[in-house]
Amino acid sequence: MFEDSSDFHDYYRTRQGRHVAMRLRRTVGDFWSRAPNACNVAIGYPPPVLRTEERPPVLSFTPMRLGLRPWPPKGPNRSALVNGRSLPLQNVQLDRLLLVHALEFDPSPSRLLDECWRVLDGAGRLLVMVPNRNGLWARAEKTPF
């Protein structure tokens, strides 16, 4: 079981982890809003699936229980530790919200989803990436799936 952001970081540095991240980045790439004033946020452990060159920039929020790893590795930090039950955002503020490695590790996933709906704009979109608990990778101890 992955306990903190260091576990995720170490996994995504492996050959298998880099391959998974590349495939997830392709999926997520078209999801982000490209509008000049768009507000895009990712929650969980999103750095492996984010591109530093996204415009407008994406913010990375990590739940407090995982601990924070600064992101991106170069340039101004765009990551923060957050409480999933009280996101530091205004109501109906976000254009896009990505959850990756968030729901499966949250002790109260329904409360996290409620908070997501609170901060999403009426036309906003939510993309939730969760592992298949019946899949082969879910049975492996060395993956976050």
Feature annotation, model-predicted:
Residues M1-R34:
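Class I SAM-dependent methyltransferase Rossmann-like catalytic core
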Residues T14, G75, K142-F145:
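Short glycine-enriched, charge-decorated loop/helix-capping segments at active-site entrances
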Residues R26, D30-L87:
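Class I SAM-dependent methyltransferase SAM/SAH-binding core
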Residues S33, P107, D121:
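Short conserved AdoMet
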Residues R85-L97:
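A short acidic, Gly/Pro-enriched loop at the edge of an enzyme's catalytic core
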Residues D95-S110:
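A short SAM/SAH-binding and catalytic strip from SAM-dependent methyltransferases
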Residues S110-R125:
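A short glycine-rich, Lys/Arg-flanked "PGG" loop and its adjoining helix->strand segment in the class I
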Residues R125-F145:
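Conserved class I S-adenosyl-L-methionine
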